[in-house]
Amino acid sequence: MESLKEMRKAQKSEGPAAILAIGTATPDNVYIQADYPDYYFKITKSEHMTELKDKFKTLCEKSMIRKRHMCFSQEFLKANPEVCKHMGKSLNARQDIAVVETPRIGKEAAVKAIKEWGHPKSSITHLIFCTSAGVDMPGADYQLTRMLGLNPSVKRMMIYQQGCYAGGTVLRLAKDLAENNKGSRVLVVCSELTAPTFRGPSPDAVDSLVGQALFADGAAALVVGADPDTSVERALYYIVSASQMLLPDSDGAIEGHIREEGLTVHLKKDVPALFSANIDTPLVEAFRPLGISDWNSIFWIAHPGGPAILDQIEVKLGLKEDKLRASKHVMSEYGNMSSSCVLFVLDEMRNKSLQDGKSTTGEGLDWGVLFGFGPGLTVETVVLRSVPVEA
């Protein structure tokens, strides 16, 4: 028994897991939000739905988004008219794009993260790949392993259909892997596409327009590991704790269902209110051990699910106007990229902290929170510790 305890102790890291590198990538196709209503109703042959188009214009104007990136080109949509219908039988065409583009964009982000990390890719011991697009076997984790030329013995974990909260999920899983497998280095990739969800408008599904106004494509990658080798590696943030919570009275608030017509997404109007009404519970539980209860004293990396969610969080917690700056910037420049979005926010925060001459990667603050929100309704709460900025 004593030798078993010694073995177990030897397997664990000395310190907490740290984020050692971040990389991001987007498709080449860029859509300016101000022009998108005209494009969307034209490409879907829905210009006769003038009242619905006016509603969509209002959604886009209030979205906080300046531009988005999407893998679907105008040429592809013209060649696949079933994708442009509201409920056209189009799963095969969507899959053909998703199973190729999901690992491809993920690879672009991963290459950037590995380059920043500084170690050879052969030192990657674990891979976590997360997406809500392109379910396939073998999965995107396998495809990425081959594309990057990772060690064939890399321990892979494939996560499908988690949605927007999974940017927090992957950090929670990576933390557990890094801290319980001494010397391990975990490559985390979230790659999300609108290929399954893009569809034309319908007067009978106004909630679908919300997703069409907000969702976008993008991939983010991290390298996570404990006990950094300071001769090569540098921690960007330490992952102090991670937890998950289902919000009360939220059944059916966000749902997604795979059909012959693709992935149909359903959003209830009270989603922002449900999140804001319950956000203080996971916050209090996460920061009680640190004695922190002033939410303006920490840095914020919140999933920018939509402008209403961010606005109501600010009001509920009494946050200063600049607290959600990083989330709003990512929303403006990229839209809602599901699980990868909050990792873009993380990258934005560390970059802006350096540009502005802040003392830490957390905008000069030591402690912070990363929030993922999504179907369930599920909230992932990750407590982060920033590090001093090195010019």
UniProtKB/Swiss-Prot annotation:
One GO-annotated biological process of the protein: flavonoid biosynthetic process
Active site (record annotation): 164
InterPro entries: Chalcone/stilbene_synt_C, Chalcone/stilbene_synt_N, Chalcone/stilbene_synthase_AS, Polyketide_synthase_type-III, Thiolase-like
Any one Pfam family match given in the protein's UniProt record, by short name: Chal_sti_synt_N
Entry annotated with the keyword Transferase: yes
Annotated catalysed reactions: N-methylanthraniloyl-CoA + 3 malonyl-CoA + 3 H(+) = 1,3-dihydroxy-N-methylacridone + 3 CO2 + 4 CoA + H2O
Superkingdom assignment: Eukaryota
Top enzyme class: transferase
CDD domains xref list: CHS_like
A Gene Ontology molecular function term of the record: acridone synthase activity
EC number(s) given by UniProt: 2.3.1.159
Keywords annotated in UniProt: Acyltransferase, Flavonoid biosynthesis, Transferase
Cysteine disulfide links: none
UniProt family annotation: Belongs to the thiolase-like superfamily. Chalcone/stilbene synthases family.
Subunit-structure text: Homodimer.
Protein name: Acridone synthase 2
Native organism: Ruta graveolens
Lineage, highest ranks first: Eukaryota, Viridiplantae, Streptophyta, Embryophyta, Tracheophyta
Gene coding for it: ACS2
